[in-house]
Amino acid sequence: LGGGLELPLACHFRLAAQDGARIGLPELHLGTVPAWGGSARLARRVGRDQAIDLILRAKTLSGPEALGIGLVTEVWPNAELKHHAVELAEELAAMPRLAVATMLRCLVTSDEKTLAESLRDERDAVHATLSSPDAAEGLSAFVEKRRPVFG
């Protein structure tokens, strides 16, 4: 709740417990408003109308409710949540760093750009990554029918 949601709102992946999670920005119950970008990031994650509903009514959502409106990206049973969070971190760590960083730059700014600008950014990303050692490893792994091991 509150600051405990504002930090995850700045993250690309947000996991929640299936049971017992309490997710929301209840600051209006305290006579104040969300800080640290909570309202702006919430509106970008779930849309303006959902953000207005959640903030002005100081609603608290469960994990599954938050998943239903796109506030979290995954929901897991409490006993499995940490395992899946670690699994996600390991999965991302195994990805090609340059390609991940380049694609994030494209995606994070895409809402602020025209389609033509986003397509240009994607084309530039292809050119920036295609000759990388990771791209060579990915292609070799594909041809050899094995899992790639990126540097």
Which role fits each region the language model picked out?
Residues 52-53, 120, 124:
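Amphipathic alpha-helical segments that line or abut small-molecule/effector binding pockets
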Residues 104-113:
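Short, charged, surface-exposed hinge/linker loops at domain edges
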Residues 1-98, 132, 136-137, 146:
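Crotonase-fold acyl-CoA enzyme core
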Residues 111, 147-151:
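Short C-terminal tail/terminal secondary-structure segment
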Residues 113-119:
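Short beta-strand->loop
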